[in-house]
């Protein structure tokens, strides 16, 4: 079998993207890094996004850290997901930064969360810490769009969380709010503050927040597509 090669330009079709992702299945992160002339870090403590960046290179992703999808021309977002030996997610999945001001008139249909989750290429990666990073294998990819039930679940959580933000209750939101979608602080340090609305409608400074998919949502999603089929 010939070795895969990184895509040098963004894929032009979903089929091309999926075919490239399928070629990576079974390879270790160390093998993929070496094939592209990259050094695999010892761990992810200082390189938390390294796996995502590595796979973006292989798949020809274009967006980087921009708010559009990773494959903007296709409307597809790339999500790597660390899993255990049974294929269960090991952590929550970051979706996007939560806007804490200027939310009047925003609906679920026009929200950044829905835009990011409209079409997702999920790539499971072995994530157990007992496996050295270079030896962790890439799993089979899944191109996914939310079905009606998933869209309803996410919408209900999003509306509950956005109501709290708009009503000045952002600092009361905990990771327990939302059944499948949660909001929690997203900042490398506690000094990185952003504006939000306080309980009396005043401007306050608070930690930036991010939307995350809870493990129960991604676990059911992966189980339905990989274990049942």
From Swiss-Prot:
GO molecular function, one term: DNA binding
GO cellular component, as recorded: cytoplasm
Similarity remark: Belongs to the MutH family.
Pfam families: MutH
InterPro entries per UniProt: DNA_mismatch_repair_MutH, DNA_rep_MutH/RE_typeII_Sau3AI, DNA_rep_MutH/T2_RE_sf, Restrct_endonuc-II-like
Protein name stated in the entry: DNA mismatch repair protein MutH
CDD domains: MutH-like (cd00583)
Location, primary (coarse class): cytoplasm
Claim: Cytoplasm is one of the keywords in the record: yes
GO BP term, pick one: mismatch repair
Keywords from the UniProt entry: Cytoplasm, DNA damage, DNA repair, Endonuclease, Hydrolase, Nuclease
Described purpose of this protein according to its UniProt entry: Sequence-specific endonuclease that cleaves unmethylated GATC sequences. It is involved in DNA mismatch repair.
Biological classification of the source: Bacteria, Pseudomonadati, Pseudomonadota, Gammaproteobacteria, Enterobacterales
Compartmental location: Cytoplasm
Signal peptide location: none
């Amino acid at each position: 079998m010939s070795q895969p090669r990184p895509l040098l330009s963004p894929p032009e079709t979903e089929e091309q993207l999926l075919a490239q992702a399928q070629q990576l299945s079974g390879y270790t992160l160390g093998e993929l890094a070496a094939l592209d002339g990259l050094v695999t870090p010892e761990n992810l403590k200082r390189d938390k996004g390294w796996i995502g960046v590595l796979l973006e290179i292989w798949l020809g992703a274009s967006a980087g850290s921009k708010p559009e999808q990773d494959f903007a021309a296709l409307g597809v977002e790339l999500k790597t997901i660390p899993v255990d030996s049974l294929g269960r997610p090991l952590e929550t999945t970051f979706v996007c930064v939560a806007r804490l001001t200027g939310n009047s008139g925003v609906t679920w249909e026009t929200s950044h969360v829905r835009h990011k989750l409209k079409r997702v290429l999920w790539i499971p990666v072995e994530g157990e810490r007992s496996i050295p990073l270079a030896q962790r294998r890439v799993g089979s990819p899944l191109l996914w769009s939310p079905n009606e039930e998933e869209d309803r679940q996410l919408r209900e959580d999003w509306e509950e969380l956005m109501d709290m933000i708009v009503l000045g209750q952002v600092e009361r939101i905990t990771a327990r709010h939302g059944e499948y979608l949660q909001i929690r602080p997203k900042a490398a340090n506690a000094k990185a503050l952003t504006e939000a609305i306080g309980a009396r409608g005043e401007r306050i400074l608070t930690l930036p927040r991010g939307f995350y998919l809870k493990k129960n949502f991604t676990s059911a999603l992966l189980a339905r597509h990989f274990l049942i089929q």
